[in-house]
Structure formats: structure tokens, C-alpha cells
Amino acid sequence: MTLKASEGESGGSMHTALSDLYLEHLLQKRSRPEAVSHPLNTVTEDMYTNGSPAPGSPAQVKGQEVRKVRLIQIEKVTEEPMGITLKLNEKQSCTVARILHGGMIHRQGSLHVGDEILEINGTNVTNHSVDQLQKAMKETKGMISLKVIPNQQSRLPALQMFMRAQFDYDPKKDNLIPCKEAGLKFATGDIIQIINKDDSNWWQGRVEGSSKESAGLIPSPELQEWRVASIAQSAPSEAPSCSPFGKKKKYKDKYLAKHSSIFDQLDVVSYEEVVRLPAFKRKTLVLIGASGVGRSHIKNALLSQNPEKFVYPAPYTTRPPRKSEEDGKEYHFISTEEMTRNISANEFLEFGSYQGNMFGTKFETVHQIHKQDKIAILDIEPQTLKIVRTAELSPFIVFIAPTDQGTQTEALQQLQKDSEAIRSQYAHYFDLSLVNNSVDETLKKLQEAFDQACSSPQWVPVSWVY
């Protein structure tokens, strides 16, 4: 299917509606009292490297620099990691590299990034490697005494940012991470609260809804995109077709853009910034899957069982109408010249050619369905997802996978292979994935999930709001 995004399309009224909904949600949150946190037991004592001058003494005493030193005692009563990593700065001094949000050190609040550590349990840290020092802190039980010079730089307020992961990540398999135990494992689609972005390569985050309160290290978008780009194959394989029009010859014309899968090959995904909105109605149901997976059966069942709720936008075509066909019902019949003009005017969200005839779905047809307060069903090529995934169309995207039961015929194996190719490239767009073992079961799960999405708070791309 040849694809073309409509450059003239904008967010429209739906964008305004979601923006207003988000603003109202923020105002309601502002009126709620903030939670109070209680630090762990810790003892601190201040002193100075040139004796004990009174507070407010000059920074220089007889040519010596006055440096405030703090003695910190931390009671470590469990096997819980301290949630801290160390590094050597440019002066080869041992400093705090990062503090994991929610960890032991973060909760008791006595250490900060950039603090210089002079002694651990009375032992001078000079001539000790970072690995040796971290091991000593990890293995110590009971009271840990640290002598530190506090970092005097101002500290930034906590971040309020949420990202949807667009790839799977396991820190145990990452050779770049500075500390595998400090890494955060997550899967595509997980919502990650970003706690700290000070390190350009390693951010700190926490999976939303997880029982684990402490944060972990995740690769920054820049690091992940560099990693993927550096190992990407020079010629990625073309994604299989899942178009309702079947396998089509590509229609090539001076008015048509190149197939957007070319641009997909250049896209390197990592994270997508999202915001949480109160419940709102999804306006479009999008079905994605390999050709032959059963999307047409599912679509037709939804249309026949819920005609007052779902509508399929009739495609436009240059094919001559058959005797039993009525213009505007199954298809809109137009001339090749008119369709070419419409394509040039960016009126189609998707178009292509099959057996010498052109087919396509117009934005306006979908808009008319929305104006009737009904839900448009689209079964489109996966390359079109980036075009329809907007606040204006507000889609709920469902990936239909082939059955994993029964005899593994050659045809089924090929279908599973095609399906996996689509999933691996476009999974970060999916709101729901279903295995189509039974059409009735798939329909039930799909409708339940769709209704749940429309009646519950939802994470949506920040571009839908701003």
C-alpha cells in the first residue's frame, strides 16, 4: 500500500478537547495535599578540614582553604542495597556519581550527587578503586560511617516526566550499563516515571504501578538510539503487507510520495513522553495484523453486532462499479484524474493500487463517522499508524496475531513469521495485542478492552495535549 500523510491536517477540535481535559485534571491535582515522607534514621555532624571555626568564618584562614566536612552515620539493618554508585572525578577523588530514587540513601537524604567521600568506616578511600569501595559498603552490616565534603552546588527540583517504553530492556544483558544491579528492567509499553536526567547516558526511572519503590538506571534516549543505529542492518527487510486490498502492486506516480516504510527504516525509537488523562472516548478502532490473520472477520462481526456503534469508512476507488454495487455504500467510485488530484491535495490517509485500479480511504470519510458520534473501524497497513495516531483520530490500536494452536502447517508458519515481523517493528504503537485462536473469544476480549480504555484514565502521547 502506498502511503501519504496529509500535511494539511491539524489536531482540530479533539486536540483542544484533550488539552482542556488535561488542564482540568492538573487543577484538580493541585488542590490535593502533598504526601509527607519520613527519612530513615541517620546521624550527621559538621566539622572543618582546618579545625573547627565558628559558622560564618572566612573561606580562607592563613592561606588554607576552609572545607566543610560532614560525618554521616547510616544504620544498615537489612540486605537492601544502598542505592548509590561512586566514581572518581578529574582530581581522582571519590565522589557520589548517582543516587537511585527511592533507595536507602535517597530516603534518608544525607548524601547528594557530587559529594566527595573521604573515609568509609574510618578508612581513607585514597588508593582504593571504585569497585573496592562499593563492595565494602555493600558488605558492611550495621552502622556505616562516612566522612564527606558536601557538594555546594544548588540542587534541581524533582522531575515530573513520564515516558512510554518503545523497546524491551534487560540490564543484565547490557554491556554498557555501569552497574547491572542498578538497572531497571522494562518491556515495550511500560510507563516509566523519569526521576533524574543529570547523566546524559543513564537516566533514573521507575516503572509506574510497580511494587518496587526505588528507581533504576535506564539508557537515555540518545544512548539507546545511538546503540540501535550502530548495530542496525544496512538494508532492513520490508514489512509484510496486511492491507484489506491484499497484495498490491505499488502505484508509482509523480504525485505520490515514496512508500513510508522507507522512512520507517530511518526511525529509531526509544521512549515517548506521555501524560495521564481522565477517561475519554476513543474515536477510532484500528486493527493491525498480517494478511490472512482474520481481521476482516473481526471487523465484519463488530459491524454486524454493533451497527449503532461501529462504522467502516467506505473506500474510494477508480474501479468501475459492478451491477449490484451502489455508489457511496461499499465504495465511492471516482475517476483516476479526480483521485490523483485528491491524493495531491493530501485528502487520503492511505491509498494504493490493486490489479490496475486505485483504492484509498479519505480523512473526511472518517471525520463524518465521528460527527455521527460513532466509532470508525480501520484495518490499515502498519506504516499508516504514524499518520492516524493523533488526538484528532484518537485511535485505539489492536494487533491481531495468528493462532498458536493446532497443526503447524507451512501456511500458518509463514503467517506467524509475517506477524512477528510486524510486531517487532510496530509493537510500540499497539494499545492491545490479541491472539486470534477463536473469533468469538477475540471479539469478546477486544470489546471489553475497548470499553475499559474509554472509561478509565489513560496515558496518551504528550503531543495529543500540547
Curated annotation (Swiss-Prot):
Residues 268-466 are annotated as: Interaction with PALS1. One of its GO terms (cellular component) is stereocilium. Residues 282-451 form the Guanylate kinase-like domain. GO terms for molecular function: transferase activity. Palmitoylated. It is found in: Cell membrane; Cell projection, Stereocilium. The modification N-acetylthreonine is found at T2. It holds the Pfam family PDZ. SMART domains: GuKc (SM00072), PDZ (SM00228), SH3 (SM00326). The modification Phosphoserine is found at S13, S19, S52, S57, S110, S243. InterPro entries: GK/Ca_channel_bsu, Guanylate_kin-like_dom, Guanylate_kinase_CS, MAGUK, MPP1_SH3, P-loop_NTPase, PDZ, PDZ_sf. It is a lipid-anchor. Residues 71-152 form the PDZ domain. The keyword Magnesium does not apply. Keywords: Acetylation, Cell membrane, Cell projection, Lipoprotein, Membrane, Palmitate, Phosphoprotein, SH3 domain, Transferase. One of its GO terms (biological process) is regulation of neutrophil chemotaxis. The modification Phosphothreonine is found at T49. Essential regulator of neutrophil polarity. Regulates neutrophil polarization by regulating AKT1 phosphorylation through a mechanism that is independent of PIK3CG activity. Heterodimer with PALS1. Interacts with DLG5 and NF2. Interacts (via guanylate kinase-like domain) with WHRN (via third PDZ domain). Belongs to the MAGUK family. PANTHER family: MEMBRANE-ASSOCIATED GUANYLATE KINASE MAGUK. This is 55 kDa erythrocyte membrane protein. It comes from Papio anubis.
